Amino acid sequence: MKILVMNCGSSSLKYQLLDMDNGKVLAKGLAERIGINDSLLTHQVEGKDKIKIQKDMKNHKEAIQIVLEALVDKEIGILKDMKEIDAVGHRVVHGGEFFTDSVLIDDEVIKKLEACIDLAPLHNPANIEGIKACRQIMPGVPMVAVFDTAFHQTMPDYAYIYPIPYEYYEKYRIRRYGFHGTSHKYVSLRAAEILKRPIEELKIITCHLGNGSSIAAVKGGKSIDTSMGFTPLEGLAMGTRSGNVDPSIITFLMEKEGLTAEQVIDILNKKSGVYGISGISNDFRDIENAAFKEGHKRAMLALKVFAYRVKKTIGSYTAAMGGVDVIVFTAGVGENGPEMREFILEDLEFLGFKLDKEKNKVRGKEEIISTEDSKVKVMVIPTNEEYMIAKDTEKLVKGLK
């Protein structure tokens, strides 16, 4: 079965074509600057060079059309005919309380997605536009929506309810949702596979650490808590996001700096985190360089704040689950940052592991980085959200037949 996975951003479209018979990526690419001038498609068939195509893309529909043309093109494509695509899996950021799992898309599902726009005004409109365009261009091809929030819908109410007047939850569905669910789900399943243990008997803490970062407590294969909340602004310090701050800071800054609420939230989303503290960059590589090679004090402080918050969250989730069997690192920093992993794990060895410093040098590959005699296993597992989306799509489409 060949599955096209799509991730539509406000002005971009990331895609992968996967052959689920062997799990291989056949082609992948990125359409950028959709609806802006100088639109660009970067397309790559597995084993061949990247190809850049400059072509006007006024909207997502035109971008999808160009992607499909590239996939069936005699010279740069991989398919003979569009009919070879058996299904399309769409990444959708927010499924609200409607969706606890991936779902086959029909008109009813689209209505519910539109009802969630308030919860993800930056992401859901583009996700929906991509779905609608695909349904027009590829009528009759089954489509599946896979949600960033769905995996965390197993959180108990005491983990997701905010201690504010309950009527706001009833009226506006203000609660903790959590994000990066597809990544947390993939790496927790993969950890159980690698350890050859049933996931039902494991307590796993998954650390998705990148420009956006979140941690999940996965007990028996179900998410029981996660660090992001109503929006992806809650939780850890991130690349440019503040994570948890005292809400009174917002009104304090409005008053002192003459800013609107929107402007302060913008600062917390785009100018804070390790970028805000260091004043250098939101790229952890730049900050590590400045901290370790140039002795930059604020860069070092940014790294310490980031690591400290991750460490605290690992500790609190160990308490929430009554123990931990596995700690997993994934995403950009988690997969490729040996120094940061060591920083985070320092003083956590009382949980029942010893870090193998040699194995911890690994970057971007699956590896158990704790010593063999460690009771608690610490692992690096590169995330693969596209594969997880394709897997869910395959499962639902096979159920149709």
Curated annotation (Swiss-Prot):
Protein's UniProt keywords contain Phosphoprotein: no
Cofactor detail note: Mg(2+). Can also accept Mn(2+).
Pfam families (UniProt xref): Acetate_kinase (PF00871)
Binding site for substrate: 91
Cofactor needs: Mg(2+); Mn(2+)
PROSITE patterns: ACETATE_KINASE_1 (PS01075), ACETATE_KINASE_2 (PS01076)
Keywords: ATP-binding, Cytoplasm, Kinase, Magnesium, Metal-binding, Nucleotide-binding, Transferase
Cellular location(s): Cytoplasm
GO molecular function: acetate kinase activity; ATP binding; magnesium ion binding
Pathway assignment: Metabolic intermediate biosynthesis; acetyl-CoA biosynthesis; acetyl-CoA from acetate: step 1/2
Self-association state and partner proteins as the record states: Homodimer.
UniProt-listed PANTHER family: ACETATE KINASE, ACETATE KINASE-RELATED
Protein's recorded name: Acetate kinase
Gene: ackA
